[in-house]
Amino acid sequence: MNGTSSPASVPKPSPGAPTRRDFLYVATGTVAAIGAAATLIPLVDQLNPDASTLAQGGPVDLDVGKIQPRQQTIVRWRERPIFVFHRTPKALQALQNEKLLDQLADPRSVERQQPPYADNWHRSAKPEYGILVGICTHLGCIPRFDQLADEAAIVANWPGGYFCPCHGSKYDLAGRVFKGVPAPYNLPVPPYRFTSDTTVRIGENPPNVKFELESVQQI
């Protein structure tokens, strides 16, 4: 891929060691937050976990029933932003459009960036809810959430989704990366499971499923 560092040249950080990716993650947080604020209903305070849960790095419960169609909420898990987007039938239809698939680097999610229960075209346990780690797989910036007014539209080079303001990488609403951008992989999908029809527990797999976020190709 032109202008893209090879996966081997982007090493995974060792636990507890600050890296360039850590710096970019913090430095771009303000920029990403400004972009996200224009598209989010202010649910952050009531949806974020309490301080003790964050400190322990344990699973985080989220009531997705409060997230309206076309709305995205961001929660924190293990100090990472987790994007939770309520996708409409039109958005799901667009994810299967051949014009879109032709623009993607890994449309079938062959690279291991998701748990087995997200090995599908919508990369999720439930099609209507996209749940992604909001960290660009290039150098760790936080992508901006952009969606078109018409979710069914597929325009040249951009059908709406996630755009990284640092170096221009683009992802669709399933977190699949576009061709010809610096990011080498799709956005990771964290471990999670639904404990009820409307409650998702981020950081915990369904019974009898083993998956750790650290096992993906690139965070």
Positions of PLM-derived features:
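N-terminal secretory signal peptides
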Residues: M1-P18
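N-terminal export signals
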Residues: N2-G3, F23-V44
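Rieske [2Fe-2S] iron-sulfur-binding domain
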Residues: D102-F211, S215-I219
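Alpha-helical transmembrane signal-anchor/signal-peptide segments
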Residues: Q46-D61
